[in-house]
Amino acid sequence: MFDFGFSELIVIAVVTLIVVGPERLPKVARTAGHLLGRLQRYVSDVKSDIKREMQLEELKALQQQVEQQARELESSMRGEAAKIEADVNKTVAEVKSGVTVDAAPVPLTHAVEAPAAPAPMSLAPHGDAASAGREPAAVPGSGPEKA
């Protein structure tokens, strides 16, 4: 801060001793120390205030940048939503134009019959009396074939 050498400090101490006197010198030195301490605290407070203001300015710039990006994102999202809405409206209009409200329902030209019930199946084993009167089914390739 100050560029005083040792010899310059000795000269200042001797002049102060002569001017103030040996009786009041300790009290003056204590007061000077308190004043110097206050000065150092004041300087450090000013430095911290300046640093805080600089950080505040940086934060404001960052906030503005984030807000700008948010506005850009919002506008692009609104544009995309408008495109999608237009596509949906176009599709709805196409569907509405293809379907007419006045169209009568088309009557059925033939009746659908219910399928016939399946024939009951025998649960009896192969070798019992229920199947004794029937012939076994022909296995392809095992007997004479008619051409």
Curated annotation (Swiss-Prot):
Q: Which GO terms describe its molecular function?
A: protein transmembrane transporter activity
In the UniProt record, does the keyword Cell inner membrane occur?
Answer: yes
Q: Which InterPro entries match?
A: TatA/B/E (IPR003369), TatB (IPR018448)
Q: How does it sit in the membrane?
A: Single-pass membrane protein
Q: For this chain's UniProt record, which GO biological process terms are given?
A: protein transport by the Tat complex
Q: Where in the cell is it found?
A: Cell inner membrane
GO CC annotation? TAT protein transport complex
Q: Which Gene3D superfamilies match?
A: 1.20.5.3310
Its domain of life reads: Bacteria
Keywords for the protein's UniProt record, in alphabetical order: Cell inner membrane, Cell membrane, Membrane, Protein transport, Translocation, Transmembrane, Transmembrane helix, Transport
> Where is the stretch described as Disordered?
117-147
Keyword Membrane part of the UniProt annotation? yes
* Membrane-traversing stretches: 1-21
**Subunit comment:** The Tat system comprises two distinct complexes: a TatABC complex, containing multiple copies of TatA, TatB and TatC subunits, and a separate TatA complex, containing only TatA subunits. Substrates initially bind to the TatABC complex, which probably triggers association of the separate TatA complex to form the active translocon.
Purpose: Part of the twin-arginine translocation (Tat) system that transports large folded proteins containing a characteristic twin-arginine motif in their signal peptide across membranes. Together with TatC, TatB is part of a receptor directly interacting with Tat signal peptides. TatB may form an oligomeric binding site that transiently accommodates folded Tat precursor proteins before their translocation.
Family membership noted in the UniProt record: Belongs to the TatB family.
Q: What is this protein called?
A: Sec-independent protein translocase protein TatB
Q: Which organism is it from?
A: Aromatoleum aromaticum (strain DSM 19018 / LMG 30748 / EbN1)
Q: Which gene name belongs to this protein?
A: tatB
